[in-house]
Amino acid sequence: LVKATKDAKHEIIISQNPEEEGAIPLRRSLNENDGLEFSYSWWMFVEDYDYKKGSWKHVFHKGNVDAWPLRAPGVWLHPNDNKLYVYMNSYKEIKNEVAIDNIPIGKWFHVSLCVSQDHMDVHINGYLKVRKALNGIARQNFGDVYVNSFGGFSGYVSRMRYYDYAIPISQVQVDVKNGPDLTLPYSSQQKPPYFTPYWWVNEYE
């Protein structure tokens, strides 16, 4: 979805219409033995919270243009606190949500979101931080993928991937080990901050 590193203040829209140029259609869940499954994996660097102070800061969502009611998933930074919110539609509930406290500021960190049937796991830097029991089976949609809409946030997003199955912890750890991409193919006017190679392998605290 995002192969390299992009400025998180600039929106990109990943079309799900295969007839549109540049579209990257996401295959629906493989529906393996455990039923509906899919995962997202990405890197984030949050510079500060002064940008858009008091407003929700958009990371990405898959759904409709205004991010409501279709969010499968939807990921946001809290308006004032260093918290990451993840939303997931299910067949019984529009707004299943989890909040992860103490998101690092000024450091790269990795997030993986794995959905399997009626539960959702969120890993930070390869460590399971929350398992959420959804109210019903997760509900996918055919909407586009919106990255850093509504002004996004102050920082960067890198190596965002989609999997049509629930990735095992071994794949999560591979994604963590690979680190963020340091190139900037998108229209970012400034280079990303210097990356200390060991920032992203330390345990999330």
Residue ranges of predicted features:
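Extracellular glycan-associated modules
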Residues: 1-205
